[in-house]
Each structure stands twice: as structure tokens, then as C-alpha cells.
């Protein structure tokens, strides 16, 4: 049986990672899940990436110890469409290459279902192939509250961050499946089970 690929996306603060973890745990052994966020962190740790960031944005792209200045990128680059596209041009190609490597390794290992968590799937043009695109969504107020609580950001910064992404409604319209995550963990678990049940019974 050919391996299937499910792509998990959605808005910041919607609980994509929680959903992905719960979905993984429905299967034994747990399904492999590629995380674009983890891949971005790995790419940013490379000396070559830091050099590209300095070339594109100047010395302020790095902190004094020479690490990527994530706060500056978040506050200055992400809200600016032109600068954001420059940043995406640096980060996205190696991240997408890592995704395809992980997919290939999963297929070689004989995995039946491969998961990929790609938060900006639609923002980068929906170029990642998948048999099913799942959008994990929440209301804006819940997104804001969660991001303030989990990331320690003030409300204004959160709104700037969210405004740099597609509206969650636009992602929902394009989804193959939608997980609405405004409620409790129990509600999220129930939706995960509903989605996974056909595969578990196969």
C-alpha cells in the first residue's frame, strides 16, 4: 500500500502541535511527524544561514553573541511584506528540502502514513503535496489568549504576528478537513479519534 501524507496547518495559537501529537499517539508505533518549526530552528543554527541573514538585513539580524535575533525578526521583518518575503526566501527552501527528505525516509521505512506540520502552508503557496490537508483552527480571541500565555507576548505584538499570516477563515475554506480547537482537550481528542478511526480500523 502506498504511503499517505497528511499535512497539518492552521494559525498560530490554534494547537497544531497538540493535535499532531495526539494524532501520532493513536498509532503504534507512533507516526513520524515532520515539524517545520523544528526544521526552521535547525536551519537558523547554521553558520551559512546567519551569513545570509546579515547580508539581507544587516548586523541587527544577529544578537551580540552571534545568534539569530528572533525578536528583531519578529518585530521588524515579519510585519513588513517585502522583508518577510526575503526571510522566507532564505528559510523556506532548506526547510522544504528537509521535509521531502523526511518523507522519503518514512516511505523507505515502510510507514503507511506520514504527517507534516507546516504552519505557513498556504502562505508559501500550498506547494507541499499531501493527500489530506488538515487545518487546526480557533477563534481570534482564543489565539491571542493562548499566545500571550504560552509565549509571554503582549497583545499588540500578538496581533502583529497574526496579521502577518493568512486569516484563519481563509485557511478553513481551503482545507480538506478542519479541527476546531476552541474548547477542551477532551474535545480535541474526540476530533482526533474521529479523523483517525478509519485508518485504525483498516
Tell where the protein language model's regions lie, with residue ranges.
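ATP-binding Walker
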Residues: 14
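P-loop (Walker A) phosphate-binding loop of NTP-binding proteins
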Residues: 11
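Walker A/P-loop
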Residues: 17
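ATP-dependent small-molecule kinase phosphotransfer cores
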Residues: 38-112
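Hydrophobic anchor at the beta1->P-loop junction of P-loop NTPases
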Residues: 8
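ATP-dependent NMP and nucleoside kinases share a basic, alpha-helical "lid"
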Residues: 100-108, 113-150
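Small-molecule kinase domains that catalyze NTP-dependent phosphoryl transfer to phosphate-bearing small molecules
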Residues: 99, 127-129, 149, 153-198, ...
